[in-house]
Amino acid sequence: MNYYFSKTVNGKFETIEIKVKTLLKNEGFGVLTEIDMQTTLKEKLHKAFRKYKILGACNPPFAFKALQAEDKIGTMLPCNVILQEHSLNKIEVSAINPMVSMQAIENTALKTVAQDVSSKLENVINKLENEK
């Protein structure tokens, strides 16, 4: 079992980003943080890097359940979703698989939450389609 779900689609980076945010919203997630690694690495290290964005996605009801089940789970929140351009109009979108990332935590209530969140994030990835 991989620690992430992933799919590569054809389309403009910005268009795919909008689609991902819409799919996340449809699954009950909000994007709390956005990190533009291309810009950050250019500004901080003066290094060129491909388009690469990290979206910190949170589903508040599930986050609340997870925090009730395990008070240190905040160290693993939010769920990261990344977009990266491997070549022109070839965009890979990946999302964390919470089932794998939370395997080390022995908590039955948390496992149920992780299964539900994993299913929703996998749905986001599976519903991505090539730009038309």
What are these regions (language model features)?
Residues 24, 75-88, 125-132:
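Short secondary-structure transition/capping segments
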Residues 18-19, 36, 69, 120:
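Short Gly/charged-rich anion-binding patches and loops
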Residues 1-3, 25, 47-50, 86:
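Short glycine-enriched loop/turn motifs at secondary-structure junctions
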Residues 80-106:
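Beta-strand/loop substructures that line and gate deep hydrophobic ligand-binding cavities in soluble
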Residues 30, 36-82:
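Compact, glycine-rich, soluble single-domain proteins
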Residues 11, 15, 36, 112, ...:
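Conserved active-site and cofactor/substrate-binding residues in soluble primary-metabolism enzymes
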Residues 104-132:
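Well-ordered alpha/beta subsegment
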Residues 1-27, 126:
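Terminal, regulation- and interaction-focused segments at domain boundaries
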